[in-house]
């Protein structure tokens, strides 16, 4: 397998089954992504709302990755389709430094004009200690973007994408 997978829960297993079905076709593009941020409810929008409401959240600091903003995901897909890139599996996320969920929350607080120190760190174990249902997540969700870049698409740095997203989110709240 080009990019091996190891599902940690039922959701992951269902995604793996979908990948298996999709890759049965010789001509396919399979896009793997993580930490998706777009319209509607998502982690970044939730953190922006908490910041505005004066909430000081404890956020997981032992899971690593990079966000994927939906605009960039769509642009990557269109690039692959319209440039005739080699068929196969591509990892798609924004580029830049690998961060934790807590780092991302602090960036949201800063980007919305709030004190990032209001965000405290917690562990995955502590965060879900009282949860009735817990779906394990990988500790490191950072994706290798080298194949996507070799196909001619360089994703934006997640910090730039976040700044644009927060600007749009602020404008939407003003309307």
Region spans (language model):
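C-terminal amphipathic/interface module of NAD(P)-dependent oxidoreductases
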Residues: 136-175
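The catalytic Tyr-centered alpha-helix of NAD(P)H-dependent dehydrogenases
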Residues: 7-14, 62, 66-70
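Mid/C-terminal beta-alpha module of Rossmann-like enzyme folds, strongest
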Residues: 76, 83-133, 164, 170-175
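Catalytic helix-loop patch of NAD(P)-dependent Rossmann-fold dehydrogenases
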Residues: 1-31
